[in-house]
Amino acid sequence: MSSTSRDAVKSVNIYGHISALPESIAAAFGGTVSTIAGPECDVAIFAINPAAGIDGPTIELWKSFDEFQTPRLVVITVMDGMEMDFDDAVLLANRVFDPLVTPHLVLHGEAGTPIGTISLNDLTTTDYSTNPPTRSTADDELQEIVKDFREEFLDQMVEMEEGAFAAGILFPAIPVNTGNGLGIDLVKEFLAELPSRS
C-alpha cells in the first residue's frame, strides 16, 4: 500500500440523486456535491439510495468518467426501515454502471437495523452500534452464511492487481450510514489508496 493519505486527495466529487443524501456523504469525506464530470476530479463517489434506484443523469455521469479513468466508488445509503437494501442496490448498479465488487456486506441487528459490516476478505465484523465500533472475527454460522458471497468476491479480486481502484478499473460498493458511521472508515481506506497530485 502506498504512503499517501486521504489528505493528499485534492478533489472528491459526490454524485447522486438527492434522496441518497449526497450532501451528508460530501461532509463525511470532505467532498463537494457535483453534477459535472471532468479530469480534475481525483475520485468520484456515487451515492445511491436503494429505495430510489439510480436516475438517468447519474448513469450518464458515471459513463462520462470512463474516458478519464477516474477512480470511482459507490456508496449505498443503508438506513432503518428501507424496503430495498444494499444487495438490491448493488444488483441494479451492476446493470447500469460497471461491474462492482462488494468487499463488505451489511449486518443487521435484531430489529432489522443496519448496525455493522463483515469483510469478505478476512471475515472481520465491525459493529457500529458501539462507541467506538467493535471489531471481531465472524462466528462459524455467519461465515457459513456469507461463504458464497466471499468466494465470488475473492474470485473477482484474483483478476485485479494492487492499485486497481486507484487506476480506475476496480469499482467497490460500500454500505454507508452517516448517522451511526457505518462504512465511513471503509470508504476512507479506499481514499487513502489514491496518490497525491504532487
Task: List each language-model region with its residue ranges.
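Structural and coupling elements of P-loop NTPases
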Residues: 1-198
